[in-house]
């Protein structure tokens, strides 16, 4: 899988020695730029856009997101609580499986409660009725599986054969659709407009019988709308048509697009050596700080990586004991010397939310930088207590 990182933007001129190591640095100006693009799409197509907290939930940036977007989508109770505490606007909550004891609070916090299957929805009937009787106001949604794989990596494709995510569209019946206020589908991962259009072609016929009933249709995330080469004009016309054809409110819930190219992960070379090729150990760990590097796998782009064969490649790995804790082979400008600072691009989304303390590896600090005014703020740093208190 190839990284979708774009131009380094303002980070090309950022002094890496201004922050701790390891550290995430998020550019507020780039976030505003991304959110403005999403807001422009929203306004032009007359739809709603929610930010997906599963991808980027740095709540220090909630005021920025709230200024531009219509709310957030969450994946279960804890994200819904976070949304209620820090974010403005609507809250749409989906989970592959809700725990019954958590559902009442989910209903209280959410505007949309989206179930993964009709069975879950049916078992929750009494809870939903009690919640509404107590004055809670929410819509009930059903996630459907388009049964139309579009992804590059099967493990990231919700329509992969045997997927547990969403109810297969060929099994929908009038009985199942009773009481369903909205339909949700999420079928993309780091993709442009064409896969969305193709997915909608599959979904349209399956849900057309209920167009008069549905209040809203949520087309999920995975849309790389803020990428420079995304077909935004085509998207706007498509969304307009979808709204007119269905008579429903249309939602998008991008995650990566909110924070695309808005963050870097800064690290330091701790040691170097040679074992058939140059190797370096850094305080950045693939398994602890960037799990997608191993899961996808993919090679993250390095800020200012040297070009040309004159600079030798060095294999950079993390400080954990996992043999496979390898980030990749890179040409480091000026050489891989001990103490050298470096950074990986496009690490705001799906890295910060996945960090862990395996092997006692230190968690990266979190900084918010506004490149428009060169204002840098240490938002959060983690110590031994964080590691200790997650254990018993």
Walk through the language-model features, giving the residues of each.
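N-terminal glycine-rich, Lys/His-bearing helix-loop that initiates the first secondary-structure elements
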Residues: 1-12
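N-terminal capping/small domains of soluble enzymes
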Residues: 10-88, 97, 285, 332-345, ...
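Short glycine/threonine-rich loop-to-helix capping motif typified by GTGT followed
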Residues: 192-198, 226-237, 262-271, 331-332
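Acidic, glycine-rich loop-and-beta core segments that form the ion-binding/anion-interacting portion
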Residues: 203-257
């Amino acid at each position: 899988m190839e990284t979708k990182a774009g131009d380094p933007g303002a980070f090309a001129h950022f002094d890496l020695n201004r922050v701790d190591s390891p550290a995430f640095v998020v550019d507020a100006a780039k976030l505003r730029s991304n959110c403005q693009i999403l807001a422009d799409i929203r306004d032009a197509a007359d739809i709603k856009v929610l930010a997906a907290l599963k991808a980027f939930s740095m709540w220090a940036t909630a005021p920025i997101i709230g200024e531009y977007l219509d709310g957030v989508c969450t994946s279960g109770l804890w994200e819904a609580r976070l949304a209620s505490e820090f974010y403005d606007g609507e809250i749409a909550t989906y989970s592959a499986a809700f725990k019954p004891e958590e559902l009442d609070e989910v209903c209280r916090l959410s505007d949309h409660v989206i179930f993964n299957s009709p069975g879950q929805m049916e078992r929750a009937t009494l809870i939903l009725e009690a919640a509404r009787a107590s004055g809670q106001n929410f819509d009930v949604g059903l996630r459907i599986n388009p049964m139309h794989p579009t992804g590059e990596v099967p493990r990231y494709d919700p329509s992969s054969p045997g997927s547990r995510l969403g109810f297969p569209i060929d099994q929908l019946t009038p009985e199942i659709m009773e009481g369903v206020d909205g339909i949700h589908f999420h079928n993309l991962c780091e993709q442009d407009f064409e896969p969305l259009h193709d997915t909608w072609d599959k979904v349209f016929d399956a849900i057309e019988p209920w167009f008069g009933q549905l209040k809203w249709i949520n087309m999920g995330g995975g849309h790389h709308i803020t990428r420079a080469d995304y077909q935004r004009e085509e998207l706007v016309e498509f969304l307009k048509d979808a709204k007119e054809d269905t008579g429903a409110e249309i939602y998008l819930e991008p995650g990566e697009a909110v924070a695309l190219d808005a963050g870097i992960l800064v690290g330091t070379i701790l040691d170097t050596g040679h074992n058939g090729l140059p190797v370096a150990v850094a305080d950045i760990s693939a398994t602890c700080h960037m799990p997608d590097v191993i899961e996808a796998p993919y090679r993250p782009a390095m800020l200012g990586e040297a070009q040309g064969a004159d600079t030798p490649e060095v294999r950079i790995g993390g400080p954990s004991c996992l043999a496979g804790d390898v980030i990749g082979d890179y040409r480091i400008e000026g050489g891989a010397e001990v103490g050298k600072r470096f950074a990986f691009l496009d690490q705001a989304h799906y890295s910060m939310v996945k960090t862990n303390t395996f092997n006692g590896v230190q968690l990266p600090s979190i900084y918010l930088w506004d490149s428009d005014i060169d204002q840098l703020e240490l938002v959060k740093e983690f110590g031994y207590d964080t590691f200790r208190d997650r254990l018993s």
